[in-house]
């Protein structure tokens, strides 16, 4: 399904990645997503647009959380990296085996759709990682904040992602 919920043919073909076929765990998620908003023909444009946006977010979160289905062979000490397709952390200088912190934030270059469109001297937190034993859900890890918030920020007082 695409972000609009329209059925489409899968675009991934393992034959295009023969070199990595032993490293790729491909999951085709083809089930109904719970809690989707119904879009009624009597809804006004704002209601329809709002429902489309919320449904796209629900689809994305559901798909991301399905990642755990591919982690059956991972040990509790294995690191799980959650990122979008265009967020590729550079692990060349990272030795995850020696990191004691339960969560790792990867500073990444800000690129706009292509590798040659880089915002110079600007990094941002894209990918995040934790050990399998610490992973509550992939979406939980995605939502974790990379900074501490002041005590007076009531919106973060009871948050599990601060």
Place the predicted regions along the sequence by residue.
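Short beta-alpha junction loops
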Residues: 1-4, 110-111
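Active-site-proximal specificity loops/subdomain of glycosyltransferases
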Residues: 3-82, 91
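Conserved catalytic core of nucleotide-sugar-dependent glycosyltransferases
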Residues: 56-60, 87-162
């Amino acid at each position: 399904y695409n972000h609009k919920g329209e059925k489409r043919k899968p675009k991934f073909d393992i034959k295009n990645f023969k070199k990595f076929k032993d490293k790729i765990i491909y999951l085709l998620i083809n089930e109904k997503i719970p809690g989707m908003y119904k879009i009624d023909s009597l809804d006004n444009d704002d209601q329809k647009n709002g429902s489309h946006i919320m449904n796209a977010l629900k689809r994305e979160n559901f798909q991301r959380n399905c990642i755990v289905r591919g982690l059956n062979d991972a040990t509790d000490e294995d690191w799980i990296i959650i990122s979008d397709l265009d967020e590729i952390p550079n692990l060349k200088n990272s030795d995850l085996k020696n990191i004691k912190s339960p969560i790792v934030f990867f500073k990444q270059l800000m690129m706009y759709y292509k590798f040659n469109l880089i915002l110079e001297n600007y990094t941002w937190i894209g990918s995040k990682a934790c050990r399998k034993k610490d992973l509550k859900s992939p979406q939980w890890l995605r939502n974790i904040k990379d900074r501490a918030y002041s005590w007076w920020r009531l919106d973060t007082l009871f948050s599990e992602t601060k």
